[in-house]
């Protein structure tokens, strides 16, 4: 007499393969098991991560709605563990037990390009108000967010307009020192927590241009 666990498992995602940040991806698992009502547990592995995260614990529910809002863009791995209803798990690892496991690659995308311009272009006299305009293309969702920065001569970067949906910044140069500046923008998709980060914040894309005050 042989006791067997599940013999096959499958995992599919909708939308398939890739989606923009902010979309809820529906994962659907199926399996061939000796008994009715097998159990499914869903897992995710973030881009660059080494540890899997349980997204939905074992239950008889074979679907999981994975919200990508705030998730890091890039290559993910999505997985399901399957156990027969009468099985404690044919395999055991530090994270738990399963009869079978299946994983699929999945790509989450965000904004693909950023532009930045100034008017007057390139140079202006001290006292001029410079209009800085940014643009973002390829963003999965409407209303990306923009954060503007200035690098003054001999100084560090300073946020001059915090993240908002406004893609323009009016830079008053009254009282500013003449010299070479840099103007920059960080861009994030409306549903992105930022692909990259440092001590100053997070962003999906950035761009900068030199600017001279005379």
Predicted regions and their residues:
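Solvent-exposed loop segments of extracellular immunoglobulin-like
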Residues: 35-41, 141-147
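Short, solvent-exposed loop/turn segments at the edges of extracellular beta-sandwich modules
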Residues: 83-94, 188-199
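Short, solvent-exposed loop/linker segments at the N-terminal edge
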Residues: 16-23, 122-128
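Extracellular acidic, Ser/Thr/Pro-rich low-complexity tracts
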Residues: 29-35, 84, 134-140, 189
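Extracellular recognition modules
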Residues: 77-83, 182-188
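Short beta-strand segments within Ig-like beta-sandwich modules, predominantly Fibronectin type-III
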Residues: 54-60, 159-165
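Proline-enriched interdomain boundary motifs that mark the N-terminal boundary
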Residues: 5-13, 109-118
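Surface-exposed, short loops/turns at beta-strand junctions within beta-sandwich domains
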Residues: 68-75, 173-179
